């Protein structure tokens, strides 16, 4: 089978969750209430995220972007992992519930990638508005999993073919539905807890050097073979 990588961004490629960092810096009290409602699942991730960014004025655009450029830290080994995928013609997709205005500039120097699927920011009004161009597909409508904004399982169904060996890399609860579709899950933090609770097998990682070692072993044992 041909390997294909679906990798989360916030808390996975970066050391911390950039949205949480951003909200804590600019609108801590207001965003905390929304975050609590999201964790308690009284509002959807999509509605919560929209409400958070609506707290920010578009006049803060440059300040917000600069803050994230200054504070976001790329996880150790990411460049080596991406280069390995590129050298072995392994499709590498970033699939994130984050937003284009900070994801794209942060990963630009590591590309090109096969694709970046994320939410988009509209700065044309007074407040920042999010546009969700990767919402849930018809398959998600069969279950109570809608409202996730950028729907990772829907992206996987759109991109992956039957011959692909799907590698999902993530850290949070928002990665779990994608993890259930994976042939192998590389997990850290909250995703590990959810995988253990619901008996989904995974391999833990701390840095992308760990991910690289796991993928190399898969290639060497023919669980996943290069496309060339």
Swiss-Prot record:
GO BP, sorted A to Z: L-methionine salvage from methylthioadenosine; L-serine biosynthetic process
Gene3D superfamilies: 3.90.1470.20, HAD superfamily/HAD-like
Gene Ontology MF annotations: 2-hydroxy-3-keto-5-methylthiopentenyl-1-phosphate phosphatase activity; L-phosphoserine phosphatase activity; magnesium ion binding
Source species, domain of life: Bacteria
Keywords: Amino-acid biosynthesis, Hydrolase, Methionine biosynthesis
UniProt catalytic activity: 2-hydroxy-5-methylsulfanyl-3-oxopent-1-enyl phosphate + H2O = 1,2-dihydroxy-5-(methylsulfanyl)pent-1-en-3-one + phosphate
First-tier enzyme category under EC: hydrolase
Assigned GO CC terms: cytoplasm
Enzyme Commission number, as recorded: 3.1.3.87
Name assigned to this protein: 2-hydroxy-3-keto-5-methylthiopentenyl-1-phosphate phosphatase
Source organism per UniProt: Lysinibacillus sphaericus (strain C3-41)
């Amino acid at each position: 089978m041909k390997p294909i990588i679906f990798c989360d961004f916030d808390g996975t490629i970066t050391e911390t969750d950039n949205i949480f960092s951003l909200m804590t810096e600019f609108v801590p009290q207001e965003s905390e209430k929304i975050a609590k409602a999201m964790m308690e699942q009284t509002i959807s991730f999509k509605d919560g995220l929209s409400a958070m960014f609506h707290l920010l004025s578009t006049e803060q655009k440059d300040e917000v972007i600069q803050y994230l450029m200054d504070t976001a830290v790329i996880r150790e080994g990411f460049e080596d992992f991406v280069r390995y995928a590129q050298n072995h013609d392994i499709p590498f997709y970033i699939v994130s519930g984050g937003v284009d205005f900070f994801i794209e500039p942060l990963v630009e120097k590591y590309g090109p990638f096969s694709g970046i699927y994320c939410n988009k920011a509209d700065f044309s009004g007074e407040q920042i508005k999010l546009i969700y161009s990767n919402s849930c597909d018809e398959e998600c409508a069969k279950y109570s999993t809608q409202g996730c904004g950028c729907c990772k399982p829907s992206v996987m169904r759109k991109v992956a073919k039957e011959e692909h060996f799907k590698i999902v890399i993530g850290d949070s609860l928002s990665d779990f539905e994608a993890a259930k579709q994976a042939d192998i899950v590389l997990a850290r933090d909250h995703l590990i807890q959810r995988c253990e609770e619901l008996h989904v097998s995974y391999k833990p990682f701390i840095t992308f050097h760990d991910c690289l070692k796991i993928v190399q072993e898969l290639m060497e044992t023919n669980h996943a073979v290069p496309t060339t």
